[in-house]
Amino acid sequence: MMRGAAPTGVVSVMVLMILVLLKQIESASANGSSLGLPPRKFCNIYQGSWVYDKSYPLYDSKNCPFIERQFNCKSNGRPDSEYLKYRWQPSGCNLPRFNGLDFLGRIMKGKKLMFVGDSLSLNQWQSLTCLLHNAAPKANSTSTRSPSGLSVFSFPAYNSSIMFSRNAFLVDIVGAPPKRVMKLDSISSGSLWKTADVLVFNSWHWWLHTDRKQPWDAIMSGNVTVKDMDRLVAYEKAMMTWAKWIDQNIDPSKTKVFFQGISPDHGRAREWSKQGGKGSCIGETKPIMGSSYLAGPHAAEMVVAKVIKTMKNQARLMDVTLMSQLRKDGHPSVYGFGGHRMADCSHWCLSGVPDSWNQLLYSELFHS
């Protein structure tokens, strides 16, 4: 042994100590404590603000072949790009940066994740498929869509599937026009939900549709059938049915259940600006800075929170409403499906805001 050289055993111990230290640093970075912030479990990741980050977006939309035309704003001619450069920053901690390989190889290996809801769930599902494709571009993947409305994106190497089931109301609609009845007390599609290891539900926007866009002709609550009722009341009744179904049919030790909070639209500028007038999301290129929204909490958001509190095995509320309210710039506007004929202030551009929703979902699963 050379003079001054440490014994082999000592070197091994030192190497082990360094590896442990690096692991602690990595863990600290993930939950924010490396910056003196409290651990993730003491932090509300849904309270925060948008900060400019030149490393964003997390993927280039032109490299994701799965994006539907209505969400592909850059391909549809949107000229500005600053809206892509904002990252969600919780007030009291840091989020782990989305790691697609960790998501596939550890969190979701051998498992199925299912988004259940309307086109906002489609928005989030497509975002996640793009994030994962970007992380593993050479991994073999398959994408299928059945007539029943189930879309499946699979990674055979990881035995993992990311699914989307189109179901805008969660409760049943039976019959054919002009006798279609929405049954607020009935769920018959739940057998499909039981096949997933992670469920992410969403429902709201279609509850506001009227006239020809309304996919039902009457509403049944209990034994009473009416032509119409207050939509927020109907929504709460349906969400209570959903909550009871989850409590009775889902084992929380085997399946994680999330409810994606209400995704807002930005069709009325007066909701975020006192000088808003009759404006909308058209021409908006920057988010609202800070952590407050002029119009305040969303009524449907409060209904969802109320319903979840009644559950025996509470679903986790992904309360994305405020963070999304602050992103008046993130919609397709006139660069969505149909072009300049109609402004879309409800859905979101991809890349864009749904990527941050999925980063929050990743954080929830990362720490669970």
Curated annotation (Swiss-Prot):
A motif (DCXHWCLPGXXDXWN motif) lies at residues 344-358. It is a single-pass type II membrane protein. Belongs to the PC-esterase family. TBL subfamily. It holds the Pfam family PMR5N. The keyword Transmembrane helix applies. This is Protein trichome birefringence-like 43. A motif (GDS motif) lies at residues 117-119. Contains 2 motifs that are conserved in esterases, but it is unlikely that this protein belongs to the catalytically active pectin esterases. PANTHER family: PROTEIN TRICHOME BIREFRINGENCE-LIKE 43, PROTEIN TRICHOME BIREFRINGENCE-LIKE 9-RELATED. It comes from Arabidopsis thaliana (Mouse-ear cress). It comes from the Eukaryota. GO terms for cellular component: Golgi apparatus; membrane. GO terms for molecular function: O-acetyltransferase activity.
